[in-house]
Amino acid sequence: AYGGDGGAYYEWSPA
């Protein structure tokens, strides 16, 4: 949740 656009792909990957 750092990039903003990515959402939570930087902190943790939900998928």
From Swiss-Prot:
Entry superkingdom: Eukaryota
Miscellaneous remark of the record: On the 2D-gel the determined pI of this unknown protein is: 5.9, its MW is: 34.6 kDa.
Protein name per UniProt: Unknown protein from spot 258 of 2D-PAGE of etiolated coleoptile
